[in-house]
C-alpha cells in the first residue's frame, strides 16, 4: 500500500539536510499537525512538522485542522539539532498513541532508488502478527512501513500484508526469496509481489480476480450484526458536515466504492466505521430520500489507495449488515448517482 513517502519527500526533504529529518508512521487518524509538533517538541527544538494529508478536494470538515484533507496517518518532523532527532527516535519510536504504535525513523530525500518499493503479500498464516511479518522481511533491508489486514469484527489477520522497503532493490530481493515460499506454520506458499500501481490499467483485471474469484480467499461473506460496530460520535459529526462527494474513480481523486442494499436507517457513521479499518477514507455519502431523509438503499465511499479499496470490496461484498446483504463494488458510470 502506498503511504505517499516518495511523493512528499521533495517538498519536505530538499537536498541533504543531515540527520535531522524524521518520518513518523502509524499516527492516529485524528491527530493534528499541532499535536504532532507538540509531541516532538518535548524532545528538542523542532524546525518544522508536517502531517501528510489526502490531496482529494471536494469536502470540508468543521475542524480547521482537518480542512485541508484527511490525515494519511504519517508525517515528517525536522529538528534543528541532529542529536535531538536521534533522541526522538530512541524515546518515541514504539510509543503507544490511542490504538496505534508509532514508528519513528530517519527520512531520506526522494530518489529513484526508493520509489516503487511497496510489496503485497498474501497467503500468510492467520496467526502471523505485524511484528512477525516485519521480522520475516527485515533481513532484506530497512522497512519504512508495514500493515497486516485484519477482520474489523474479530481482529484476526486476513493473511494479507503490505510492506514498504526503503529501496526498490530490497523489495526485489524479498520477492526473489519469498515468492512461492512456505513460511513456518503454513502448508501453502505465500505470494510476494510489488503492490499494484493505481495508474496501471491492469488493476481492472486484478480487481476482477480479487472480487469475483469463486474461491474467495476470505471464506465467503462474513455475517455480523450491525451492533458489532463501535461508533465514534466525533467521527460521525465530522462526516455529517461533508457537503459534497466526488464519485469519480481515479488516481487523482481517489477510488470511489458503490455500496448497495443499505437499510433505511443507515448513515455516514456506519460507512465510516465499516471501511475505515481497511485504509484512508476521504469521503462517505449516504443517498437519502428528499422527503423522509431516510437512506434510499445505497451510498458511496471514497478511499485514497487502490489496494485498500480493493481489499475493502473483497471483504465487504456479501457482508450482512442487520437484515441486509451488501453489494459492494467500484463505482462505474452505470452506478446510481
UniProtKB/Swiss-Prot annotation:
RNA-binding protein that binds to the 3'-UTR region of mRNAs and increases their stability. Involved in embryonic stem cells (ESCs) differentiation: preferentially binds mRNAs that are not methylated by N6-methyladenosine (m6A), stabilizing them, promoting ESCs differentiation. Binds to poly-U elements and AU-rich elements (AREs) in the 3'-UTR of target mRNAs. May be involved in cytoplasmic mRNA polyadenylation. Acts cooperatively with cribp to stabilize AU-rich sequence (ARE)-containing mRNAs. May play a role during gastrulation. Required for the vegetal localization of vg1 mRNA. Its main location: cytoplasm. The keyword Repeat applies. It is found in: Cytoplasm; Cytoplasm, Cell cortex. Interacts (via RRM3) with cirbp. Unable to form oligomers. Part of a ribonucleoprotein (RNP) complex, at least composed of elavl1/elrA and/or elavl2/elrB, igf2bp3/vg1RBP, ddx6/Xp54, ybx2/frgy2, lsm14b/rap55b and, in a subset of RNP complexes, stau1/staufen. Keywords: Cytoplasm, Developmental protein, Gastrulation, Repeat, RNA-binding. Pfam families: RRM_1 (PF00076). It comes from Xenopus laevis. GO terms for cellular component: cell cortex; cytoplasm; nucleus; ribonucleoprotein complex. The lineage of its organism: Eukaryota, Metazoa, Chordata, Craniata, Vertebrata. Gene3D superfamilies: 3.30.70.330. Belongs to the RRM elav family. GO terms for biological process: 3'-UTR-mediated mRNA stabilization; gastrulation; intracellular mRNA localization; mRNA stabilization; regulation of mRNA 3'-end processing; regulation of stem cell population maintenance. The keyword Endoplasmic reticulum does not apply. One of its GO terms (molecular function) is mRNA 3'-UTR binding. Transmembrane segments: none annotated. Ubiquitously expressed in adults. InterPro entries: ELAD_HU_SF, Hud_Sxl_RNA, HuR_RRM2, Nucleotide-bd_a/b_plait_sf, RBD_domain_sf, RRM_dom. SUPFAM superfamilies: RNA-binding domain, RBD (SSF54928). This is ELAV-like protein 1-A. Residues 20-109, 117-197, 255-333 form the RRM domain.
Amino acid at each position: 500500500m502506498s503511504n505517499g513517502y516518495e511523493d512528499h519527500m521533495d517538498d519536505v526533504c530538499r537536498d541533504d539536510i543531515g540527520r535531522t529529518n524524521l518520518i513518523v508512521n502509524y499516527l492516529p487518524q485524528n491527530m493534528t499537525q499541532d499535536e504532532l509538533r507538540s509531541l516532538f517538541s518535548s524532545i528538542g527544538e523542532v524546525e518544522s512538522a508536517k502531517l501528510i494529508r489526502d490531496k482529494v478536494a471536494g469536502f470540508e470538515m468543521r475542524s480547521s485542522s482537518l480542512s485541508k484533507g484527511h490525515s494519511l496517518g504519517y508525517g515528517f518532523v525536522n529538528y534543528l539539532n541532529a542529536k535531538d532527532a536521534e533522541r526522538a527516535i530512541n524515546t518515541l519510536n514504539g510509543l503507544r498513541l490511542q490504538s496505534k504504535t508509532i514508528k519513528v525513523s530517519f527520512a531520506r530525500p526522494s530518489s529513484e532508488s526508493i520509489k516503487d518499493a511497496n510489496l503485497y503479500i498474501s497467503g500468510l498464516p492467520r496467526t502471523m502478527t505485524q511484528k512477525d511479518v516485519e521480522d520475516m522481511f527485515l533481513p532484506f533491508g530497512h522497512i519504512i512501513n508495514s500493515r497486516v489486514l485484519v477482520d474489523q469484527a474479530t481482529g484476526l489477520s486476513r493473511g494479507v500484508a503490505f510492506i514498504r522497503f526503503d529501496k526498490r532493490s530490497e523489495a526485489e530481493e524479498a520477492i526473489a526469496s519469498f515468492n512461492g515460499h512456505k513460511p513456518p506454520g503454513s502448508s501453502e506458499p505465500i505470494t510476494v509481489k510489488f503492490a499494484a500501481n493505481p495508474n496501471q490499467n491492469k488493476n481492472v483485471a486484478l480487481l476482477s480476480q480479487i472480487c469475483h474469484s469463486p474461491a474467495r480467499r476470505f471464506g465467503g461473506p462474513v455475517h455480523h450484526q450491525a451492533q458489532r460496530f463501535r461508533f465514534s460520535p466525533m467521527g460521525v459529526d465530522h462526516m455529517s458536515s461533508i457537503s459534497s462527494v466526488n464519485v469519480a474513480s481515479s488516481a487523482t481523486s481517489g477510488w470511489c466504492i458503490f455500496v448497495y442494499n443499505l437499510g433505511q436507517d443507515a448513515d455516514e457513521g456506519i460507512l465510516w466505521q465499516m471501511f475505515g479499518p481497511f485504509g484512508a477514507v476521504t469521503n462517505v455519502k449516504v443517498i437519502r430520500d428528499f422527503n423522509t431523509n431516510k437512506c434510499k438503499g445505497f451510498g458511496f465511499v471514497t478511499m485514497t489507495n487502490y489496494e485498500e479499496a480493493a481489499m475493502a470490496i473483497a471483504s465487504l461484498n456479501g457482508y450482512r449488515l442487520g437484515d441486509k446483504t451488501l453489494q459492494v463494488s467500484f463505482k462505474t458510470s452505470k452506478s446510481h448517482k
